[in-house]
Amino acid sequence: MSKIFERIDKYTALVMQSHVYVAEDRDDIKRNLDRALNLIDYGVGYFWELPARLVVFPEYFMQGVTTPGKGEHAIDDFMKKAITLDGPEMQVLGDKAREYNLYIAGG
């Protein structure tokens, strides 16, 4: 085995795919985020043999995929559902990452 791999502790990577509601408002984003947080709690508890250190979610896991022309007409409609780095969603994900000492990635 390569020496570099001898220095890396084995861990579990959780690759998550959940049902996502297409967000019409911030409440829908919260519902999607709550579902994601519950999946993290479940996954960390399920894979107890090796600690979970990485959780990966797909793109749009908080807002869902929207289609321009189907009710969304301007950048303002998209900005109402935008996730910002200093916003509450990122704070909650950061808290969850610290709780379990892991990294969370999402598109």
Locations of regions flagged by a protein language model:
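Hydrophobic structural segments
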Residues: 1-107
